[in-house]
């Protein structure tokens, strides 16, 4: 639209629309970038408050949405995770949310080209050292996780899921 938004609306997989105030947004020669602060909800952890940046480049001659991990986003180094070894540790649900949001905006703007999106997390590489990531096979930064688009409080099920993941990798 050419205007810097006061809020950014995100549609979660559960259909809930969440509005957040960006830290900043800017246009570039080839697209735009925007940063938000990670909300930890009821599950405050070492990632709460970190700036998450989405940089989008318009690709008029390339269809679809390509998603990359930038600074502060880890790389998958072991099999058994959501993404293949070598890929950015951005799970399939956040990837789908990003793609769907861009596809909606493209339709609203009558844009028929593609997008290249780079997700970065300020302080992600340093913060990741204080997480499970190095143990489960994510190196160099944080994982972009999620199943519902809403932070759920830490639960026994989350702990069991982590243990199951480690067992799957050991098998």
Where do the language-model regions lie?
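Generic N-terminal targeting/processing segments that precede catalytic cores or assembly contacts
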Residues: 1-136
């Amino acid at each position: 639209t050419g205007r810097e938004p006061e809020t950014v609306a995100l549609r979660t997989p559960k259909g809930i629309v969440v509005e957040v105030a960006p830290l900043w947004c800017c246009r570039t020669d080839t697209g735009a970038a925007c940063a938000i602060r990670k909300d930890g909800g009821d599950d405050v952890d070492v990632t709460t408050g970190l700036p998450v940046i989405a940089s989008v480049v318009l690709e008029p001659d390339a269809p679809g949405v390509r998603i990359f991990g930038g600074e502060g986003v880890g790389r998958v180094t072991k099999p058994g995770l959501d993404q293949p070894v070598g890929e950015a540790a951005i799970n399939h649900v956040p990837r789908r949310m990003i793609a769907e949001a861009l596809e909606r905006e493209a339709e609203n703007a009558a844009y028929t080209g593609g997008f290249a999106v780079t997700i970065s997390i300020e302080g992600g590489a340093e913060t990741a050292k204080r997480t499970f990531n190095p143990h489960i096979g994510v190196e160099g930064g944080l994982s972009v996780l999620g199943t519902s688009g809403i932070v759920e409080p830490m639960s026994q099920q989350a702990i069991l899921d982590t243990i199951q993941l480690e067992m799957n990798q050991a098998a």
